[in-house]
Amino acid sequence: MKKYYLFLFFTILCLSINAQKTNSCSEEEFKAKKQAYLAEQAELTEEESAKFFPIYFELQALKKDVNKKAWKKALVGKDPQTSEEQYEEILNEFIHAEVQNCKLDKEYLKKYQAVLTNKKIYMVLRAEIKFNRNMLKIIQTPKQK
């Protein structure tokens, strides 16, 4: 009987560990999935993908840094003792981040145009929106137990 319970315990343990692994992925796995999706949806050739995605992920990293600074500042707003002046600083930081992101988008559009046609860039950006929506749906879907 002990062997049965041990077997059952380890089986459940293995299944739960395996389930946790399938619900999350590393940043590199996520990037690879995103790259594959965008390339397929935008009908990029291997050559186009090889030139485009290093630029694309460079921009994503820069935007992540800009947004990280804004969200770090926003944590102050969780404190009930936050003053109006501090909230104003937080809001200004969000606006500053948006402006910085727009400037980066404009700068990187020129880099994109050096390797892709405008139509392909448009297709990538549309695919990116779809990808992000799909990811939100996955995240918001209640996990079955």
Residue spans for each PLM region:
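N-terminal hydrophobic signal/anchor transmembrane helix of membrane proteins
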Residues: 2, 68-74, 127-133
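Amphipathic alpha-helical segments
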Residues: 34, 38-115
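Soluble, non-transmembrane alpha-helical interaction regions
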Residues: 25, 46, 82, 121-124
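Bacterial Sec-dependent N-terminal signal peptides
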Residues: 1-25
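Short N-terminal segments immediately surrounding and downstream of signal-peptide cleavage
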Residues: 21-39
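Amphipathic, charged alpha-helical segments and their helix-to-coil junctions
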Residues: 43, 58, 102, 106-145
